[in-house]
């Protein structure tokens, strides 16, 4: 799946580079392996979203989608350098290992947050745009095809002879 993402766009390429860096770092570092497993699971879970974001950004040249792409790409590039620096540390350098572990955890949380929030905001914007288009289509259809009118008249008096219910169907065939 990562190979398909890399063929996609700039985000896909950055995501595949990060995925490869995480694989290499897992082989080198024993102390941060569990965090890297979690990061790899996060990458696997957001891969379909990144594919969608890449696909939609190619179709629509929108300034907001470009901003989202740029932020995600920078975040992924920073993560690649962070993971690679973590993998290069020696075992004895415990203080830096813990700092990198904390930074990788923060990155994972930030990545999930950015993807969740940006995707939700973009979905809300798309829904709003879709509602406006549907309203426009509805008004055009109302102009083309007038709706029939139903009238219901109910008359009731206390006397026995004045009870009546009348239904009228009117169509505007002008």
Swiss-Prot record:
Every RPW8 domain range: 1-153
Which GO CC terms are listed, alphabetically? membrane
What's an example Gene Ontology biological process for this entry? innate immune response
Q: Which domain of life is it from?
A: Eukaryota
Task: State the membrane topology.
Answer: Single-pass membrane protein
Q: Where in the cell is it found?
A: Membrane
Show which residues constitute the signal peptide. none
Positions in coiled-coil regions: 68-145
Q: What up-regulates or down-regulates this gene?
A: Expressed in leaves after powdery mildew infection (e.g. Erysiphe cichoracearum UCSC1). Induced in seedlings by the beneficial symbiotic fungus Trichoderma atroviride.
Sorted alphabetically, which keywords does the UniProt record give?
Coiled coil, Hypersensitive response, Membrane, Plant defense, Transmembrane, Transmembrane helix
Pfam name, any one: RPW8
InterPro entries found in the cross-reference section? Powdery_mildew-R_dom
Instruction: Identify its protein family.
Output: Belongs to the plant RPW8 protein family.
- Described purpose of this protein according to its UniProt entry: Disease resistance (R) protein that induces localized, salicylic acid-dependent defenses. Confers resistance to powdery mildew (e.g. Erysiphe cichoracearum UCSC1).
The remark listed among the other comments is: Ecotypes susceptible to Erysiphe cichoracearum, such as cv. Columbia, are lacking RPW8.1 and RPW8.2 but contain in place HR4.
Protein name listed in UniProt: Protein RESISTANCE TO POWDERY MILDEW 8.2
